[in-house]
Amino acid sequence: MSTYLIGDIQGCDSALDRLLQHIDFSPSRDTLYLLGDLINRGPASADVLRRCMEYGDAVKPLLGNHDLHLLASAHGVRKPGRRDTLQSILDAPDRQDLLKWVAQQPLARCLENPQGQQLLMVHAGVLPQWSLKDVMALAQEVHDHIRSEGLPEFLQHMYGNTPNQWHATLTGHDRLRVIVNALTRIRFCTPGGAMDFESAESAEAAPVGLVPWFECPDRQTRDVMVAFGHWSTLGLINRPNLMALDTGCVWGGCLSAMEIGHDFTERQLHQVHCDQAQQPG
């Protein structure tokens, strides 16, 4: 039995198929944790979702910004953009099954091994003020709204860059928006946790006054192992307490799977090269 963490697939089903063949994946034996952005920008978003659904409990995804954008598009809150490739889902005969499955997925997952080590998985990142317990509770808040009858209203208010900083006193749509933006969009922030949404460059090109979210000096999750995707220009990171696994599949990079052992520090990287589906920019 093997456990794999897989970075952003973004609708590249052929690359996912080749990766699963490469690792000899068996849904009866292995488990895949998908770090969000399963769909969009690539050519076969509906096929990715169908494949994941077919594998049942062997696939454990979490939601990224593109997955939430699908729900917003499906509910008429946002029209698909010029570069979106969501139509294969929106026009699918099994559209409702696909959308229902997406809406059931969480925004964060946590694994704990027999030694008590914890591995937090999110799509983009976390704010420095949040402990692991905070992350899981706040992700659940959003998850509860996504699974409720209030989903359309939640989606209408989900978009926006403000507030850009967490305060425990936040309520309503502002509170939910900050949580969503941190878990699915953050790259850079100030050392105090004010999020920036303008720059998507590499960590070395951090704008003045900003740091990658994981470099915040007082980050409460610094002693927790964190795995994330979302940031293709960051490239692969494999540190004892940090794994970044978006390696730019949709842009012609690689699709990456990190195989992890029982103590989470035993790791083996598996990659397949991807055909370029879109040009960056």
Which functions belong to the PLM regions below?
Residues 2-10, 119-125, 244-245:
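Active-site-proximal beta-strand elements of phosphoester/diester hydrolases
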Residues 2-4, 57-60, 222-225:
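Short active-site oxyanion
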Residues 8, 37, 64-65, 102, ...:
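Divalent metal-coordination and catalytic microenvironments
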Residues 12-14, 40-42, 66-72, 129, ...:
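Active-site environment of divalent metal-dependent phosphoester hydrolases
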